[in-house]
Amino acid sequence: YEPLPAVLTIEEAIARESFVSPPQTMRRGEVEPALASSPHRIAGELRCGGQDHFYLEGQIALATPGESGDMQVISSTQHPTEVQHGVAHLLGLPFNAVTVEVRRMGGAFGGKESQATIIAVLAWKARRPVKLRLPRDDDMCATGKRHPFLFRYDAGFDGDGQILALDLTLAANGGSVADHTPAVLTRALCHADNCYFLPTVRFRGLACKTNTVSNTAFRGYGGPQGMLVIETIIEIIARQLGLAVDTVRRRNFYRIGHNDVTPYGMTVEDNIIEHVVDELDRTVDLAAWRREIGVFNRRSLVVKKGLATMPIKFGISFNRPALNQAGALVHVYTDGSVVLNHGGTEMGQGLFVKVAQVVAEVFAIDLDHIRVSATSTAKVPNTSATAASSGSDLNGMAALNAADEIKTRMATVAAEHFAVPAGEIVFASNRIYAGNRSMSFSELAALSWEKRVSLSAAGFYATPKIHWDFATHSGRPFYYFAYGAAAAEVAVDTLTGESRVLRAELIQDCGRSLNPAIDLGQIEGAFVQGMGWLTTEELWWDAKGHLRTHGPSTYKIPGSRDVPPILNARILSDAPNREATIFRSKAVGEPPLMLAISVWLAIRDAISSLADYRRAPSLDAPATPERVLAAIEEVRGRVK
């Protein structure tokens, strides 16, 4: 045979009209006349690279054939039901003949879903258990990544920096098969507005087919890419007009009561973005910080500092409404101990602790009385992936509903026992009170059993209000938005292109946080992971389509020395979710990753200082030393 030429880039795929799914379009108004009538106009291209998940524990699974023609799979997966369906399909079995169990994962970030299906085939053929553990090099070569994107934009704006029209094409490298690409592209379209009201838009999404691995879900799921391009456009507008970037941002923010509808038709009802940005400014005094950097840059000939902020508005829910559901199973034993099972999976994000906290709160018992059992398709079926930052929202509410049902039954037993109305029964501090009389939770559990009252319940939750029209790309895809803001300071060596993050200040809207310690860890971790995507993590494919950066020696994730010496993460205070989420909390897994765009913008700011902030550099992501140095030379050349 003769090898065919490989299609490896987005540009090649577009030229050959090679796509894994049909183009997507989101529009509002007529963009061509709006662009033509705009006082100012810019057009250009931007590229951002992919990113490997680099979970500490690689892909690993164990498949064991059963004695009745069934299959048991223990897997490191975020989506047990997807593995169940995949195995059943490959083996020609009904779903009830395949059980998938997940105790925990050593990280995932979107990269662990369906890979375990192959070992079930091997186990089925061999009629004996088969275990798979991919070495790091094989894992990186065989699995999908964050989608690289090519953006082409044409924006019209007025003299104040107000965007009047935007024609934007977002082309994603989907790889060899569709995988998650269509959904990632949809979410990118839904976040290409970020915090800004865009009166006239045409967003076009292209899912490009190339001869690389099929790219897949990754923390943020298209949101980071969508936000990256609009922030770049905002910066270029500011430089062209000689305005401060933050001033242009504020002039384009969504407002309360007007200019509050997204390009996909959802009203931004919970808008607190200006409040979050103001809180960041009050906390760190951005004006004084910027003056300090100006003084440094005037004195330093080689090293230049940059400062940039990044506001975020990130939608929470799966774009596909059917996925926004969850189940949970709660058992109370006669000694007062509790077992909880739900459809979410634990990958180090603290989901099991948060859901256990919910049940502990309902019963008013200590957390150590609750055991969360391994996620299993045989216990809670038909689950959605633990993804889209919705794990706590969905599974926490399902567990709440199950625990509430049991609590109501137990309260009825207690009311009968104390001869008082059920409304007078109070659960508090591991005890049940009726006035000045009380019994322990375990005593009530035993009494309920004696009274033949069920101490088990299944809970279910479906996210309300959401709907989405895939044909028109309109509706309410998100239950609510999570907001945040960041400011980052970097130093750039203009002789080598090397950069260093010196300080980062982060504020994240977590609603009424279920667990501030966990949430702060998520904020910091997501930020550093986002830094890696935008600065050091570069995927490089050779001319034959072989990945050459397939290990820590060639693929550079951030290390401990890359973390800013000053990194302050804060949870926005006194900001409960206006929607009826679990205890009015908000999701935290994905949104903080986009705060790291402040680092990339700060690098651009440092380069722009070479032109007295009158020009925006041509800089793609990741901002490797080579790219930064090229951008520096390009800016210097334009100034000359």
Predicted stretch roles:
Residues 1-507, 566, 598-611, 628-640:
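Structural alpha/beta core scaffold segments of enzyme domains
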Residues 135-137, 368-381, 542-562, 619-621:
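Substrate-binding beta-hairpin/strand module that engages nucleic acids
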Residues 221, 386, 390, 578-591:
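Amphipathic, heptad-repeat alpha-helical segments used for oligomerization and assembly
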Residues 368-374, 558-585:
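Generic long, charged, amphipathic alpha-helical segments
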Residues 511-515:
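Cytochrome P450 core scaffold surrounding the K-helix E-X-X-R motif
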Residues 581-600, 604-611, 616-617:
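C-terminal structured "cap/appendage" subdomains that terminate the fold
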